[in-house]
Amino acid sequence: MELLYIDEAVVVCVKPARVLSTDEPGGLPELVREALGDSQADIRTVHRLDRVVSGVMVLARSAESASELSRQIREDKFQKEYLAVVHGVPEADKGTLTDLLYRDKARRMTMVAEAPGKGVQEAVLDYEVLSRAENLSKVRIHLRTGRTHQIRVQFASRGMPLVGERKYSTLEDPCEIALWSHKIGFTHPVTGKFMTFSKEPPKVYPWSIIA
């Protein structure tokens, strides 16, 4: 568990793949407590990454800090930037993807809807292609909305599944999903200072073959 920043209000860390963001046995808050050497530490989840996704996250160290960070997320003042490697090449080097998505709870999957309806929500993201190699594209992503599996579904539905995707792709890639929480930015809940934290993906496939 890599800790990037610690103070009395927040902990910024790098979430490993296959770890839940929520506070349960083996979840990220428990791993943070172990890293801090304090099994009773107050560590609270304020935003989530899918279990299979890795990268930078912030956790609150009090109810007050959690409330303030959650407010920033609700009011779209919390910045999140992702990196992904997808199969194929987007039509444009930069653009916006907009879809209607709904959650199939029985199958535990997010699906693209053809028309508005009950449980259907708009999903919007901005992307920019950073580089290409071997019919793969590395993209930078900013979410305008935060739907479950949004990035994964929006690219997969256009024939560009993320490398390592298991749920929304039939391709068999020899790696974890290539979706990485690259950068976060938020106003510190105590000091009021705006802070940003970033971490590059590990140099493993497919990140190792695409600059």
Put a short name on every predicted segment.
Residues 129-132, 188:
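Short, low-complexity Ser/Thr-rich regulatory SLiMs
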Residues 87, 141-144:
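A structural micro-motif recognizing beta-strand termini
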